[in-house]
């Protein structure tokens, strides 16, 4: 077996397909040989063993001392105890029943009105997962209309509230936060709650929490008698929460088949428990990542789905892959700086954007093409200019143009996009991430960099409070003086805070030149 990208034998030998879900995986255009695949067999013995331990309930997130159980969500029978098993089954049933009753108008607001919309408040995986679900699967005029607050940009919040306007009384406000203490969803929730109550709308009639039992958010929702609380277990991480209530509730509210989505993920999970590398799609996919990046993440992953409904999938994978695999240390404490950078948009748009560099520029990437074989039922106007055939031609042409320049790629083909195949596709990448992490000996389930960022942000927020307190005294302050009065602060973040607070704000008098921060003198306006 050679490394020839255009070898038909290599393509046939490494093409994976499963007829239950009609998904193909082709890694033949990655630079590897048969001998290299064989060389990973011993490593994969350890990989399969570690995944088996994880699924059995081992403490896999060492930093947080918790289990990692998103695979149980798709097959409760493998959960480590009957309590967790029964909890999963109950949660799935509750979500399906709730969605059905909302869509049938059995559950209504306090004014006996049927719900029409959802304003979803969630950060990271708590926002990206639901967005992927609705963008990929929602049919026109079916189910509730979804809007998202996935950032605390004040313009975004104002825009979404303005768009909903008259529909606010019939909007469900879904707040997702496992701990209930994450600042962004908490701040967004408080702003939206005040706005809603100012419009004389009863918040608790429309509010839903997705959170961990006994969290801050859980207690608040209980105390205020919110419409519903759905469980988000301690053992589910944000980036792998899409088969929990975080992803299942949107499915139910757009009238999609919750059980089929779970079944697709479960089928893929089972296929990736096969211990023969060539018969295991996640083993093949993670091996392709490993060989392309020489086991040290030398190449970026460029995700190109050739279907608009999967455009969000690139962003979804960005978090799943980068937050899981971007690690400074391996499990032995050695500095390794592992990771795979992910970006992408959609084909064929990207052929007119950055594919030029992919073919002729620096060779620091591999592509993941995602192809769909189906076509809309209403295609009578297509005539001889069938867009499906053109799209397929563009994909194959781009793939061929890249391989002719020895640029590496992976191709995943789905017969159609539905609950079953989307569930399977997501599970494939989740499993591949787990496998790759084991191959390079890192923990895929912690996020020390994210936690460090949260800690640093909390310090800045504390500085902001202290700056405000100082300026409220009515005295004049330089950046240097403020810095000296706030313990452990430095001048640069204080300047950022002052500029954010005071620039263009008539509440403050400013002397000096903004291009020379040392000259800036600030005083609270006494008017």
UniProtKB/Swiss-Prot annotation:
GO terms for cellular component: cytosol. Belongs to the GPI family. This is Glucose-6-phosphate isomerase. GO terms for molecular function: carbohydrate derivative binding; glucose-6-phosphate isomerase activity; monosaccharide binding. The keyword Ligase does not apply. It is found in: Cytoplasm. One of its GO terms (biological process) is glycolytic process. The active site is at residues 323, 352, 454. Catalyzes the reversible isomerization of glucose-6-phosphate to fructose-6-phosphate. SUPFAM superfamilies: SIS domain. Its main location: cytoplasm. It holds the Pfam family PGI. Keywords: Cytoplasm, Gluconeogenesis, Glycolysis, Isomerase. PANTHER family: GLUCOSE-6-PHOSPHATE ISOMERASE. The keyword Metal-binding does not apply. It comes from Prochlorococcus marinus (strain MIT 9515). CDD domains: SIS_PGI_1 (cd05015), SIS_PGI_2 (cd05016). It comes from the Bacteria. Pathway: Carbohydrate biosynthesis; gluconeogenesis; Carbohydrate degradation; glycolysis; D-glyceraldehyde 3-phosphate and glycerone phosphate from D-glucose: step 2/4. It catalyses: alpha-D-glucose 6-phosphate = beta-D-fructose 6-phosphate. Its EC number is 5.3.1.9.
């Amino acid at each position: 077996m050679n490394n020839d990208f255009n070898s038909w034998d290599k393509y046939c030998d490494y093409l994976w397909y499963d007829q239950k879900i009609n998904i193909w995986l082709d890694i033949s255009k990655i630079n590897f040989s048969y001998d290299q695949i064989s060389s990973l067999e011993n490593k994969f013995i350890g990989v399969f063993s570690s995944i088996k331990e994880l699924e059995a309930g081992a403490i896999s997130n060492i930093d947080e001392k918790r289990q990692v159980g998103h695979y149980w969500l798709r097959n409760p029978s493998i959960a480590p105890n009957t309590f967790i098993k029964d909890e999963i089954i109950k949660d799935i049933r509750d979500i399906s029943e709730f969605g059905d009753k909302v869509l049938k108008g059995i559950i209504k607001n306090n004014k006996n009105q049927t719900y029409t919309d959802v304003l979803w408040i969630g950060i990271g995986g708590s926002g990206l997962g639901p967005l992927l679900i609705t963008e990929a699967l929602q049919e026109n005029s079916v189910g509730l209309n979804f809007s998202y607050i996935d950032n605390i940009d004040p313009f975004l919040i104002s825009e979404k509230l303005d768009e909903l306007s008259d529909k606010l009384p019939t909007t469900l406000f879904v707040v997702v936060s496992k701990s209930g203490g994450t600042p962004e969803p908490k701040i967004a929730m408080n702003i939206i709650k005040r706005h809603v109550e100012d419009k004389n709308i009863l918040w608790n009639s429309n509010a839903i929490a997705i959170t961990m039992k006994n969290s801050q958010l859980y207690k608040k929702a209980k105390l205020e008698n919110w419409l519903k609380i759905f469980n988000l277990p301690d053992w589910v991480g944000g980036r792998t929460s899409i088969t929990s209530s975080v992803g299942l509730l949107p499915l139910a509210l757009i009238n999609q088949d919750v059980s089929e989505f779970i079944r697709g993920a479960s089928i893929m999970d089972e296929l990736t428990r096969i211990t023969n590398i060539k018969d295991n799609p996640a083993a093949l996919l993670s091996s392709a990542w490993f060989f392309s990046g020489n086991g040290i993440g030398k190449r970026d992953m460029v995700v190109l789905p050739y279907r608009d409904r999967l455009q969000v999938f690139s962003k979804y994978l960005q978090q799943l892959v980068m937050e899981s695999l971007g690690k400074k240390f391996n499990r032995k404490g050695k500095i390794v700086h592992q990771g795979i950078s992910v970006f992408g948009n959609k084909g064929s748009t990207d052929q007119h954007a950055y594919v030029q560099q992919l073919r002729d520029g620096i060779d620091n990437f591999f592509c993941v093409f995602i192809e769909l074989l189906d076509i809309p039922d209403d295609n009578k106007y297509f005539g001889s200019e069938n867009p499906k055939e053109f799209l397929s031609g563009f994909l194959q042409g781009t793939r061929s143009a890249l391989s002719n320049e020895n640029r590496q790629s992976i191709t995943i083909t789905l017969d159609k996009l539905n609950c079953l195949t989307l569930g399977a596709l997501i599970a494939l990448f989740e499993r591949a991430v787990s496998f790759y992490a084991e191959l390079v000996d890192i923990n895929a389930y912690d996020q020390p960099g994210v936690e460090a960022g949260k800690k640093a942000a909390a310090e800045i927020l504390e500085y902001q409070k202290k700056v405000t307190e100082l300026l409220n005294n009515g005295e004049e302050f330089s950046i240097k003086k403020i810095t000296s009065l706030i313990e452990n602060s430095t001048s640069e973040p204080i300047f950022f805070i002052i500029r954010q607070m005071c620039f263009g704000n008539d509440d403050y008098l400013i002397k000096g030149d903004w291009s020379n921060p040392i000259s800036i003198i600030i005083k609270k306006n006494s008017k």
